Amino acid sequence: MGVQFGDFIPKNIISFEDLKGKKVAIDGMNALYQFLTSIRLRDGSPLRNRKGEITSAYNGVFYKTIHLLENDITPIWVFDGEPPKLKEKTRKVRREMKEKAELKMKEAIKKEDFEEAAKYAKRVSYLTPKMVENCKYLLSLMGIPYVEAPSEGEAQASYMAKKGDVWAVVSQDYDALLYGAPRVVRNLTTTKEMPELIELNEVLEDLRISLDDLIDIAIFMGTDYNPGGVKGIGFKRAYELVRSGVAKDVLKKEVEYYDEIKRIFKEPKVTDNYSLSLKLPDKEGIIKFLVDENDFNYDRVKKHVDKLYNLIANKTKQKTLDAWFK
């Protein structure tokens, strides 16, 4: 879901060239949902193997990761851990929305309105624990580092960006800004739109507010921990309240658990237990997982596996040379 203030903050269109030579932390769950929604057949249904299991996420992880490496961008995938208890309401809302979409999809199929069915099919994107674990397994076969966050993946990715271990957080949501990520890149794992760069300092300077104020605006509008926000208050009114200095008083009165929500953003659970090193891929392991177990096309996978091997071999070789001549 994420906070919805994208229309009110400065964004800059960038190219893949602008990210050349940089490491980025990918909000894993956000990207996997994108893949489930966008990587589909013409009738709107997701890719499946012969057992009927959805494989769209594996397709996205494999080919998008290689595409980034081809552009000299090193992806570090970050996955969610245990969500804060306050997120349960948001998860319930999401489940209900998917259930409604599934009913409408089935109704459209009965009427043989396949265009309408495809529209609703994209909203029925269930990401199972098995899919997530398989994506992690695929990344390990590919030699790509991933991080298991103790709680929210975006919080962990933001922490890594603040430390300077990665240059930016990659996510379609804006929540990473609330965790203090210095830079957020959108549209990097999509295909239709140009990447956008959002810089936290530019946002705060443009609005003439602090990060604390930005978090308050988000809480007014609604976050994953208080979906819907404060009734009748959108960005403009929230901004006015923040600028007038009365925002906190209003929020404490209107938002249950305000202090706890604020603490989630300002003091998130994070870990330093991660590696950023690429490893040579397990070629046979990748082919076994994608082709033998999930019915991907052998020729296409083999071509990309060879490409992946060469990309990582060259990167690790260059890193060794750089270290030698330091």
UniProtKB/Swiss-Prot annotation:
It comes from the Archaea. Mg(2+) 1 binds at residues 27, 80, 152, 154. Gene3D superfamilies: 5' to 3' exonuclease, C-terminal subdomain, 5'-nuclease. Coiled coil: none annotated. Optimum pH is 6-7. Binds 2 magnesium ions per subunit. They probably participate in the reaction catalyzed by the enzyme. May bind an additional third magnesium ion after substrate binding. InterPro entries: 5-3_exonuclease_C_sf, Flap_endonuc, Flap_endonuc_arc, HhH2, PIN-like_dom_sf, XPG-I_dom, XPG/Rad2, XPG_DNA_repair_N. Its cofactor is Mg(2+). Residues 116-245 are annotated as: I-domain. GO terms for molecular function: 5'-3' exonuclease activity; 5'-flap endonuclease activity; DNA binding; magnesium ion binding. Structure-specific nuclease with 5'-flap endonuclease and 5'-3' exonuclease activities involved in DNA replication and repair. During DNA replication, cleaves the 5'-overhanging flap structure that is generated by displacement synthesis when DNA polymerase encounters the 5'-end of a downstream Okazaki fragment. Binds the unpaired 3'-DNA end and kinks the DNA to facilitate 5' cleavage specificity. Cleaves one nucleotide into the double-stranded DNA from the junction in flap DNA, leaving a nick for ligation. Also involved in the base excision repair (BER) pathway. NCBIfam families: fen_arch (TIGR03674). This is Flap endonuclease 1. It comes from Methanocaldococcus jannaschii (strain ATCC 43067 / DSM 2661 / JAL-1 / JCM 10045 / NBRC 100440) (Methanococcus jannaschii).
